[in-house]
């Protein structure tokens, strides 16, 4: 089972009500604004390593969302974070 977590050196900033991922050293090239579900996943991955199944169950328990939509949100979140070097597995 693949476990992922947020790497050290990244944090959230709240800019006018939008949560944005920033690198602590200023090297993140892209601005990443998190949706509500992405923010939830971020907070989940900051606390511990989790599997995709853990993420799915947490979203379904905390949001009024279908399994298909939740899986899509997870895939987009993971792809975006991986492309920007923010998560490790």
Over which residues does each language-model region extend?
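Acidic, low-complexity/disordered tracts enriched in E/D and polar residues
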Residues: 1-43
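Long, charge-rich, low-complexity alpha-helical segments
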Residues: 30-89
């Amino acid at each position: 089972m693949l476990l992922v977590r947020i790497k050290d050196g990244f944090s959230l900033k709240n800019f006018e009500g939008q949560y944005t991922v920033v690198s602590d050293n200023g090297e993140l090239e892209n601005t990443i604004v998190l949706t509500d579900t992405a923010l939830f996943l971020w907070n989940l991955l900051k606390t511990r390593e989790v599997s995709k199944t853990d993420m799915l169950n947490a979203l379904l328990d905390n949001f009024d969302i279908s399994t298909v939509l939740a899986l899509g949100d997870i895939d987009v979140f993971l792809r975006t974070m991986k492309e920007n070097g923010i998560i490790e597995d």
